[in-house]
Amino acid sequence: TVEDFALLHPGGSLGKRLSLKISEIMIKGRDIPVVNENTSIKDTILEITSKRLGTTCVIDASGTLVGVITDGDLRRLLEKTLEIKNITASEMMTKNPKTISKEFLASFALQQMEKFNITSLIVTDETNKPEGIIHLHDLVKLGLQSR
């Protein structure tokens, strides 16, 4: 299997790529796009734009992940209405976003992105608080590709 190859050949570049954990390559800290439920659409767009990932996590007052907003969500909202001035993050977010643990292999993250047709996964801890994000482009840059 792919996992066996990575374990047997850890020194080679292929082995390194195959054995990379999400924790080793995820975007962390201040670079994670995050807004709270009451954030205005204007500030949400600014957060998505400034972090350059095409998405943002939405958290509640305790810091728990409650949703995600993507560029696509914003486009779909604008297709419905141009009256967006008073809309908050909680009103436009997708609830129950796809998440992943930092302990998984990066190759598994790629499989999940392909399975759900998404470009990023939020890395959460055991209490569902965001601790990172992983983007498809980062996986491709590492040389990971689908089977």
Predicted regions and their residues:
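Short beta->alpha transition motifs characteristic of CBS
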Residues: 1-10, 53, 65-79, 118-119, ...
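Bateman (tandem CBS) regulatory domains
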Residues: 20-32, 86-97
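The conserved cystathionine-beta-synthase
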Residues: 35-52, 59, 78, 99-118, ...
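Phosphate-binding active sites in nucleotide-utilizing proteins
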Residues: 43-92, 103
